Amino acid sequence: MAPPSNPLFVVLCWALFAYLMLVLRDIQAAERQYRTESRDGKCVGEDGLLHAPTELWYNDNDCSEHTCVNDNTGYYEIIRRCTLIVYPPECHLMNGTGTRYPKCCCKVTCELN
């Protein structure tokens, strides 16, 4: 069965594809929250160091941002990392433009003919 050749259908498909690419471009961060050990009123971070509540720190080796939070249930480390991006064959990944999160995250670029 041949794909539809109606020009309006083709334009609508490309418009939907372009919209989805814009949405995917903006959804780059994956955020996870982990309960963490605490010591002296501070979080023991993934890096093994002590971090005060609301402190923000980075791991430039894995392009991530970390925050220590404390609520009435305990201490947590919030970790933000780049997400895996799924993209069509006519697109490709470009390296991030910086060394620190989120600028180090890859971006998808597409060339529409």
UniProtKB/Swiss-Prot annotation:
The keyword Transit peptide does not apply. InterPro entries: SVWC_dom. It is found in: Secreted. Contains 4 disulfide bonds. Pfam families: SVWC. The keyword Cell cycle does not apply. Keywords: Disulfide bond, Secreted, Signal, Toxin. Residues 1-29 form the signal peptide. It comes from the Eukaryota. GO terms for molecular function: toxin activity. One of its GO terms (cellular component) is extracellular region. Belongs to the scoloptoxin-16 family. This is U-scoloptoxin(16)-Sa1a. It comes from Scolopendra alternans. The lineage of its organism: Eukaryota, Metazoa, Ecdysozoa, Arthropoda, Myriapoda.
